[in-house]
Amino acid sequence: MPTPKKGARLGGSASHQKKILSNLAAQLFEHGAIKTTDAKAKLLRPYVEKIITKAKRGTLADRRNVLKLIPNKEVVAYLFNELAPKFEGRPGGYTRIIKLENRKGDNAPISQISLVTEQLASTEAERANRVAASKAKKAEAEAAEAKAEEAEEAPEVEADTATDKAAEAEAAEAADEAAEDK
């Protein structure tokens, strides 16, 4: 990883910042979520995302490059063997930062950074199902419109006056029963 050139350093020097990020990444992979300051969480996110992308490729060269960044063999083995397969279907966005309340002693803003291991909400199959369902709805709507147009074109038949009077009588009886129930 190149030497950081811009912005404030975590801990003062570039070498100290690299060690801080290395230790934070190792703890994140080991525990799945850690609480740290907002500044450290924001710097840790791209660092961890690049490491996970290398772990997903899984080559020997990638493993050696990750071991340069995180010199803990157990954590790297866990990352390559167990965490990387969980992220196979995810193209990116392996971490989530949630802001928490400020720290009690120095009022520093605290965040929780965690690994997102849930499956993506929309996979390709689910997307295909949604597209097919929306096309079916459109076809049903078009069919309903066609039926409505046919009904409008059909000649109107005059209603029988006897059936109208019978319907009015039934409605009056129902209203009387409703009034009696109250």
Curated annotation (Swiss-Prot):
Residues 126-182 are annotated as: Disordered. SUPFAM superfamilies: Prokaryotic ribosomal protein L17 (SSF64263). GO terms for molecular function: structural constituent of ribosome. The keyword Transferase does not apply. Keywords: Ribonucleoprotein, Ribosomal protein. Residues 137-149 have a biased composition (Basic and acidic residues). It comes from the Bacteria. GO terms for cellular component: cytosolic large ribosomal subunit. Coiled coil: none annotated. Residues 150-161, 170-182 have a biased composition (Acidic residues). It holds the Pfam family Ribosomal_L17. InterPro entries: Ribosomal_bL17, Ribosomal_bL17_CS, Ribosomal_bL17_sf. GO terms for biological process: translation. Belongs to the bacterial ribosomal protein bL17 family. Part of the 50S ribosomal subunit. Contacts protein L32. This is Large ribosomal subunit protein bL17. It comes from Corynebacterium jeikeium (strain K411). The lineage of its organism: Bacteria, Bacillati, Actinomycetota, Actinomycetes, Mycobacteriales.
